[in-house]
Amino acid sequence: MSPVTEQWGEVLRTHLALGEDRPAVRAAATFSSEAGFFAAVGREGEDAWRYFRDVAPALQDEADGGNRGRDDVEALCTVCEETLHPRGLRLAGVDWRRESLERVTDAVTGTELYLALLRDGSRSMWVVRTRQGVCTFVLVDGETEGHATEARSLALDFDSFLAGQGY
């Protein structure tokens, strides 16, 4: 899959169980340093862009003359690094705090994945980065620890799928 294909949305929706009743995931998005955020899906067709960007991509492109540079790519690329960018991580007007960072070895491919837990008050989001630099942002639905644990598992499973696809 290329970052510009429309398949990403459906793949996210399927792998993160966004069509199920009471899913653990509220919204998810994929990001790369080359493309910025290039796919976002929400539960039950909800507009997921509002969780990851200040404005929708089409409006953003018009507003900045087609330059999709409004994602803070430099800062976003550090979310799964040892040291965060000094600006921190700001998504759609929310300053997220990184609570933890882990290196996880994918059981199927043996690929090393980087997993970060972000917090904004009682809200949480998992971010997993593949070796090829594709990041999956998974916003947990609600504040329960069970949903956070399930969303973590779904995020890792999805990135395992990406690693198997060569990402």
Model-derived segments and spans:
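Non-catalytic interaction/Regulatory regions outside core domains
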Residues: M1-Y167
